[in-house]
Each structure stands twice: as structure tokens, then as C-alpha cells.
Amino acid sequence: MEELQGYLEIDRSRQQHFLYPLLFQEYIYALAHDHGLNGSIFYEPMENFGYDNKSSSLIVKXLITRMHQQNHVILSVNDSNESIFVGHNKNFYFQMVSEGFAVIMEIPFSLRLVSSLEEKEIAKSHNSRSIHSIFPFFEDKLSHLNHVSDILIPHPIHLEILVQTLHCWIQDAPSLHLLRFFLHEYRNSNSLITPKKSISLFSKENQRFFLLLYNSHVYECESVLVFLRKQSSHLRSTSSGTFLERTHFYGKIEHLVVVLRNDFQKTLWLFKDPFMHYVRYQGKSILASKGTHLLMKKWKSHLVHFWQCHFYLWSLPDRIHINQLYNHFLYFLGYLSSVRLNTSVVGIQMLENSFLIDTSINKFETLVPIIPLIGSVAKAKFCNVSGHPISKSVRADSSDSDIINRFGRIYRNLSHYHSGSSKKQTLYRIKYILRLSCARTLARKHKSTVRAFLKRLGXEFLEEFLTEEEQVLSLIFQRTSSPSYRSHKERIWYLDIIRINDLANHS
């Protein structure tokens, strides 16, 4: 306990108490513009919003002043979308403040991460950031396990929980008050958070801001797993996550251990399971074990109880599904993963005797589901719900090469992301859809038929369109067998993919 107290004292000294004044600094919004997430409002031309770059800090200052005034007309629920700043949409100001607020809130987290990496001497590896690195882990571990739990992490039932979560990390009272006021007013003024709907944690308009809130919330939910992993002698590991440590963590865990010892003395052994593995991406997590079904049910019960009692999160039991790996497809990150028993017969010749031996090996397989992927492509209007390619509307000044490059880039990104599939038939189907959709789009632009357009363009269109992936694979896997066969069977995991492809995200 003395060691923990010493850690807490050091951690308190690192807390940031003067973050609020940074909201009025111009360079904060320049950082939000330069390093924001794709799809952020700051990636759009500022002139589209009638916005002068040089006056950004003045606008933010005026907005925050209005927010703190008793009569905050700009945020009134009964107002229209136009604020008192003539010509500016009020949602734009919310996005400005949220982007800047997210940049500021990331400062203490970044400092803790750098400090933790230095203390634990963890090398900064970009490969560990890739979500594709999860699947080699699956290949190595899942084939030896028995049961898996699909877990949907519960959402906070009240906005105040999000504020209190950040309060454990940051003790800057003005910033927290602004965050609380900002969240409630944003919800009440045609925002992304409405009383009738759950919190939109992955808003396209405020990705950086809500990802910050969501990651801190999820880390709280996972804290019991982090603690138990550190306590078990069989589960020694070093984490490289962004939210590595947090204030008041051990205070809550100490109380949890007391509760467990008083109420569940006979079941503490389950936390020592040496074959438990945990993986998460966004709101979905996976808990896999070599233990029995009863063990997994106990884990499920304790997780639900922990979330409800210590974080006031109401998690329904049906949000955690327990299945056997051998007869269940695990849907994760756009892949259907499973463990299959492959049986092979080996002939052995020993002097005058020969005999056959049956060998069985557990093999990890990953497939791309065709129906959800076609649904995503249809939603993007490349085909109808039946998978029949259709033309897309394009700008009149778009050149043919730009259109072809756009369709080619979409397919290459999909093929790049789904390169780990055990079977490539789904990708070939998507390739056919996108290629014919491109041809229909070009034919529509030139007021011609697809056949006449392809005849005029020649066979170079088919050779040049979307063949880069197959060419790369054929160069990598030059074997005695045909390249097409090798590219059909080989799985490749790329370690430069840090987010799920939009078309691959069918959830």
C-alpha cells in the first residue's frame, strides 16, 4: 500500500491545473486543424463557412463568454440554427470549441503516455497501433482456447458520468465546468446527444471530441481487467495503450477487492486463469479462455456486477454472449473468424511395414462476409441491394482518369484491409461491382453504352483498373504454383492500418 501511495503522490504532481486558458490561444485551433481526424470540420475549406482564419480565437472567446452569461441566447433551445453571429451556424461554433477542447484534454494524457513509455522503456512501435496486429494474435492464441465472450461495452446512462471520469484525470475546475455546460447545452440544442437516443460517441462531426470522452469511459470499464491482470502472476505483461494509468484507480480497486473477498471468497480463483485473453476495438470487446463454460459465466456475472455497482452502468446480460470457438463465427473488425479442426492423413513407411496416421490441427480462419459488405457498397450507391452495379453521379468537370482513379482507390483500400481473408471470392465480387459501376458511370458521363465505351477504351481499361493488389501479391508469392492460386490462398496482415475501412464497417 505504501508503494501505491507513493505512486499517487507522484501522479498528482503531474496533473494539469491550467488547461482552461489554452482555449483562448490561436495555436490550439491550428493544431486541431492540422492534426484533426479525417472528416473533421477543420478539413473543410474555411471559406465554405464564411469563416476568417485570423478571427478564430475572437469567435471562440465571444462564444465562451456568451456561454457563461446568464442569458446565453446563442445556445437557446428555441432558437433556429442561425446564431446571433449573423451568417454562422451555431453547430459550427460547437464543433470549434469541441475540437479545441479535445486538443487541450489530450495534453495530460500524452504527457502520461510519454512518461510511462520512458519509465518502462517501451520502444515506440507503429506496428502495435495497427488493428491488423490483432489477427496474428488471434492466430497464435485462439486455436488453443475453448470459449469466447462477445461483449458490448455499456454506454454511460448520464452525461455527468463522462465528466466525473475525466475528473479522475484532470483537476482543472474551469475546464470541467465548461465541459459539463457544453455537453448539456449541446444535447439540448439539436445536438448529437438527444434524450431519446444513446450518446453518439462516434459522431462524424465531432470525432476527436467524442473519441476522447469515449476512450476515457471505456478505460474505466476495463479497469478491473487491467488490475486483475497485474495482480496475477500468470498474466505478466506490459501495456502500451494510451490510457496507461489514472488517478484514484487503486482506491476503487481496493474497495472492489474488499467486496470480492467478503462476498465471493470461493470464486477468487477464477481471476487467476492463466489462459484468459482480452481484445477490444471501439465498443466491442472479446474475452477468450481455455476454461469451462461455467468459468465464462462467472466472468460475465462479475463484469456486469462491477459495471453496475462501481460505475453506475446498466449492462444487460444479453450484451455478453458466450460461445464455443469450435462452432461459432466471431464477427470482429469486418471479419468472420473461426477455429476449425483440420484433419489430414500422413503415410509412414518403416522398413517392410507402412501405416497411416490421422493428424488433427486447429486452424484459425478469417472470412469476409459477402452480404454485409455488399450492403455497405450499396449504401455508398455503387450497386443496389442485390449487388447489381449502378452508375454514380459525378461532377461534370471530372476527367475520366480521375473517375477511374477514384474507383480504383476505393477497391485498393478495401482489398488492402481485407487482405487477411482466407478466401478471396468476396473481394472478386466487390471488384466486379466497382469496375462495372465505374464503366457505367463513365458511359453515363459520355452519354454512351457500357459496351460501346469499353470497346472504344480497349482492353487497357481492364488491365489498368484495380490490378495493383494482384500484381503485388504475385511478386511476393512467386512459387511453383500459379500466382493466382497463391494470391487466392495467402493471407496478409498489414501493419499500417490504424482504423477500420468505412465500407468494411457494416455494424
From Swiss-Prot:
Protein function: Usually encoded in the trnK tRNA gene intron. Probably assists in splicing its own and other chloroplast group II introns.
Cellular-component GO terms for this entry: chloroplast
Domain of life: Eukaryota
Keyword match Chloroplast: yes
Entry GO MF terms: RNA binding
Species: Magnolia alba
Protein name (database record): Maturase K
Primary location recorded for the protein, binned into one broad class: plastid
Keyword set includes DNA-binding: no
InterPro entries for the chain: Domain_X, Maturase_MatK, Maturase_MatK_N
Compartment(s): Plastid, Chloroplast
Keywords, ordered alphabetically: Chloroplast, mRNA processing, Plastid, RNA-binding, tRNA processing
Family: Belongs to the intron maturase 2 family. MatK subfamily.
BP GO terms, sorted: mRNA processing; RNA splicing; tRNA processing
